[in-house]
């Protein structure tokens, strides 16, 4: 049985990750959720090409959105450079919880342009979370 994944994504890193997820025969992508304010057109095309639901929502922690997510019955959520913070109810909704991939050392570097701020602050080390 395939692992049913909900994919929350934005930007170039998420394109590469989605490509890899789609190639894995042990996984099934239930949907692609893009940022609401400026939905990623590349993700939208990839979702359509692969017959995946493409969704956006301004408040992913709302009761309305949680209702949608329950219907997908995902085993795992994967968040790749997504722009909204997941609250515990959403994180814990899938049986295997949620994996968040972020290009900075949380909670110290949140948001966008993380590498820029690490350089400006003359950090001696840098990581991803």
Question: How should these model regions be labeled?
Answer:
Residues 1-129:
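One-carbon transfer enzymes
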């Amino acid at each position: 049985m395939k692992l049913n994944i909900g994919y929350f994504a934005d930007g170039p890193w998420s394109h590469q990750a989605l490509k890899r997820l789609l190639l894995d025969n042990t996984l099934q992508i239930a949907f692609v959720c893009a940022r609401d304010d400026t939905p990623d057109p590349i993700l939208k095309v990839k979702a359509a090409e692969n017959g995946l639901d493409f969704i956006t929502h301004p408040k992913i922690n709302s009761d309305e959105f949680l209702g949608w997510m329950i219907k997908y019955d995902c085993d795992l959520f994967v968040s790749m450079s997504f722009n909204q913070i997941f609250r515990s109810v959403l994180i814990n909704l899938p049986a295997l919880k949620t994996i968040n991939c972020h290009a900075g050392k949380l909670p110290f570097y949140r948001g966008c342009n993380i590498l820029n701020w690490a350089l400006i602050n003359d950090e001696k080390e840098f990581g991803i979370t």
